[in-house]
Amino acid sequence: MRLCDRDIEAWLDNGKLGIDPRPPVERINGATVDVRLGNQFRTFRGHTAAFIDLSGPKAEVSAALDRVMSDEIVLPEGDAFFLHPGELALAVTLESVTLPDDLVGWLDGRSSLARLGLMVHVTAHRIDPGWQGRIVLEFYNSGKLPLALRPGMLIGALSFEPLSGPAARPYNSRQDAKYKGQQGAVASRIDKD
C-alpha cells in the first residue's frame, strides 16, 4: 500500500523520509511528491563506437562507455537543455532523496510531458530501500519536436511504499552499490556488474 499525502508529510516531519530541499505542501498531492529537474546532464556522443558488447570483458565495456558518454554538462541558471527527437540523455532531480530501510520509492513521469513525447525514465523507476542521493532521469524524446528542458521545472512524481519489514540488504549498506550517494548525472556503470 502506497503512502498517501498525509503519511508522506508525517514521514518527512519525523525524519524517516528525507527530501532535500523539502517540497512545499502544494507539491505533495494524493499519493505523490512532485520533483524538479536539476541542472546536470549527460549525453551520448554520436557514433564513437560501432556497438557496446554489454556482456564482453569488463575493461572493454568500460572503455566503450568512456568513448560514448559525454562529460557532465552543468547548465547555468536560466539556460535550457534541448532534447531532440530520438535522443537519450541522463539528468538528475534537483531534490536529493533519502529512504529508510523499510520504504521503496517509485518515480513516474508527468502525463503532460509524456503527451509531448518525453519519457522521464526509460525503465529504471524503482528507488531502493536505503537509497540516498539524487535520482537519475533517463530522458528519451519520442516526439517529433525538440524539447527545451529547464532546471527547476516539474519533471516527475515520487510515490512511496512501505515494506513488510526493514530490508536485510538496503542499498546504502551494500558494498556493490554502484550509485551510492550519487549527486550528479552518473553514467551507466554496467561494467561494475
Curated annotation (Swiss-Prot):
Pathway: Pyrimidine metabolism; dUMP biosynthesis; dUMP from dCTP (dUTP route): step 1/2. Catalyzes the deamination of dCTP to dUTP. Residues 169-193 are annotated as: Disordered. DCTP binds at residues 110-115, 128, 136-138, 171, 178, 182. One of its GO terms (biological process) is nucleobase-containing small molecule interconversion. The keyword Hydrolase applies. The gene is dcd. The active site is at 138 (proton donor/acceptor). Coiled coil: none annotated. GO terms for molecular function: dCTP deaminase activity; nucleotide binding. The lineage of its organism: Bacteria, Pseudomonadati, Pseudomonadota, Gammaproteobacteria, Enterobacterales. Pfam families: DCD. Disulfide bonds: none annotated. It catalyses: dCTP + H2O + H(+) = dUTP + NH4(+). NCBIfam families: dCTP_deam. Its EC number is 3.5.4.13. Gene3D superfamilies: 2.70.40.10. Homotrimer. Belongs to the dCTP deaminase family. Keywords: Hydrolase, Nucleotide metabolism, Nucleotide-binding. This is dCTP deaminase. InterPro entries: dCTP_deaminase, dUTPase-like_sf, dUTPase_trimeric.
